[in-house]
């Protein structure tokens, strides 16, 4: 099979607000979240620790949308695998608008991290003959041990910009 490229996004971040769950006319769920990711670095000129936060719009479809809507909330830490998509439309004034989103549908993954009871729930949206069995399996599977939060949050790397090889 010839490959035309790879479109895969992996993020770990925190929800900025509660999920927004909607249903399409055919009854399938669509859930939108905003996810914050941050990086920190030491300013080489003055030694100050700097931080930059990026906000990402994530869109879940079908069973993952239902699971995200039920289990995620503002402040939840989550691992996301999806694909990048940019949409274009014209607003009420005829001006072209663009939005870039991470789409989590077939082949995507969501894993809840950092819960209070040190457990996580993993949900994948793979190709399945019976999506109902998939969702029952995901919701009834044993909860997995979550990542060590200190490893995930230790983004304070001590290096100068000149050390970067590019």
UniProtKB/Swiss-Prot annotation:
Gene Ontology terms: biological process: DNA recombination; DNA repair; DNA replication
Important for interaction with partner proteins (motif): residue ranges: 161-166
CDD domains tied to this protein: SSB_OBF
Alphabetic keyword roster: DNA damage, DNA recombination, DNA repair, DNA replication, DNA-binding
Gene Ontology molecular function terms on file: single-stranded DNA binding
Region of interest (Disordered), ranges: 143-166
Membrane-spanning ranges: none
Pfam families, sorted: SSB (PF00436)
Cellular-component GO terms for this entry: nucleoid
Domain of life of the native organism: Bacteria
Residue ranges annotated for the SSB domain, each copy included: 6-111
Function: Plays an important role in DNA replication, recombination and repair. Binds to ssDNA and to an array of partner proteins to recruit them to their sites of action during DNA metabolism.
Subunit structure: Homotetramer.
Protein's UniProt name: Single-stranded DNA-binding protein
Biological source species: Buchnera aphidicola subsp. Baizongia pistaciae (strain Bp)
